[in-house]
Curated annotation (Swiss-Prot):
CDD domains: RecA (cd00983)
SUPFAM superfamilies membership: P-loop containing nucleoside triphosphate hydrolases, RecA protein, C-terminal domain
Superkingdom of origin: Bacteria
One function term, GO molecular function aspect: ATP binding
Protein's recorded name: Protein RecA
UniProt source species: Pseudomonas putida
Role, per record: Can catalyze the hydrolysis of ATP in the presence of single-stranded DNA, the ATP-dependent uptake of single-stranded DNA by duplex DNA, and the ATP-dependent hybridization of homologous single-stranded DNAs. It interacts with LexA causing its activation and leading to its autocatalytic cleavage.
Gene: recA
């Protein structure tokens, strides 16, 4: 840059700082770049697939999927993990369906959880914005976008047409709160539901509620699906769950994670540690036996996971090694390519099957 341009730029920067305050424009090289802070999801595999060890703070996240796929369970798991590190969490229950007993079983400290059950969509989003602007709340869950009913719709008759009201409400609210979320370094998670588009001949007919604004403003979008049942004998005790990262602004997207959600217990984390430990060569598997550092820890995955539950220090040690090994840029990039290929293959299979 020549001297005239340098002087002109310095004058412009000086004028901007006087008018808008120091820090209105910054040179990236003047400040040390820091990793984006993250909050664990409670699933080790999903934390690794996200690339930064969890969901990013200071960003908007959307989690969507069919009914009974584990959306609320996953968000309650995020709250439980955040509370372990002293975070303040809030749950905006627009569906009026939060079960405190179930939340407690998943590890949520219900006594410290802030809960709001608003009457209208405007009230829910205004409460969310006020909590964000307080700079005192670390995680806010909005459950769900589909239940954010505009005031005009609630006050109207049952058969009245209100075209695009909810989409306009979401668009206006997200414009307003995005900057506040970044300044407060708060994680805001919107749970969303799936609807079917009528008359779609090619491609997926599925869409999410609330218009397109949330798709643009969300830094991470997670598609969660139930893929099967977990059984003990003939009794169904949980769900096989797959999460696809449809959008990711903080790491390469299109990865996926698979884990089990056990009814009344939440994400089967010790089972994930065993599986990932074996795949990374940290846990030895010989026949049905699992061993760690030469010591047998159980016959069968269930017994090995039970051993880790009884010896949390060993489980934490294995988990730390897995995170150190996989949450490096090279390992994450390699894992991302493999998962993207696998996800593409799954999408093609789904399309062939007519899903």
């Amino acid at each position: 840059m020549d001297d005239n341009k340098k002087r002109a730029l310095a004058a412009a920067l000086g004028q901007i700082e006087r008018q808008f305050g120091k820090g209105a424009v910054m040179r990236m090289g003047d400040h040390e770049r820091q990793a984006i802070p993250a909050i664990s999801t409670g699933s080790l595999g999903l934390d690794i697939a996200l690339g930064i060890g969890g969901l990013p703070k200071g960003r908007i996240v959307e989690i969507y999927g069919p009914e009974s796929s584990g959306k609320t369970t996953l968000t309650l798991s995020v709250i439980a993990e955040a509370q372990k590190n002293g975070a303040t969490c809030a749950f905006v229950d627009a569906e009026h369906a939060l079960d405190p007993e179930y939340a407690g079983k998943l590890g949520v400290n219900v006594d410290d959880l802030l809960v709001s059950q608003p009457d209208t969509g405007e009230q829910a989003l205004e409460i969310t914005d006020m909590l964000v602007r307080s700079n005192a709340v670390d995680v806010i869950i909005v459950d769900s976008v589909a239940a954010l009913v505009p005031k005009a719709e609630i006050e109207g008759e049952m058969g009245d047409m209100h075209v695009g009201l909810q989409a306009r409400l979401m668009s206006q609210a997200l414009r307003k709160i995005t900057g506040n979320i970044k300044n407060a370094n708060c994680l805001v998670i919107f749970i969303n539901q799936i609807r079917m588009k009528i008359g779609v001949m090619f491609g997926s007919p599925e869409t999410t509620t609330g218009g397109n604004a949330l798709k643009f403003y969300a830094s991470v979008r997670l598609d969660i699906r139930r893929t099967g049942a977990v059984k003990e004998g003939d009794e169904v005790v949980g769900s096989e769950t797959r999460v696809k990262i449809v959008k990711n602004k903080v790491s390469p997207p299109f990865r996926q994670a698979e884990f089990q959600i056990l009814y009344g217990k939440g994400i089967y984390r010790n089972g994930e540690i065993i599986d990932l430990g074996v795949s990374q060569g940290l846990v030895e598997k010989s026949g049905a036996w699992y061993a760690y550092q030469g010591n047998k820890i159980g016959q069968g995955k269930a017994n090995a996971a039970k051993y880790l539950a009884e010896n949390p220090a060993i489980g934490a040690e294995i988990e730390k090694q897995i995170r150190d090994k996989l949450l490096t840029s090279g390992a994450v990039a390699a894992a991302g390519k493999a998962a993207a290929v696998e996800a593409d293959a799954d999408d093609m299979a789904d399309a062939d099957a007519g899903y």
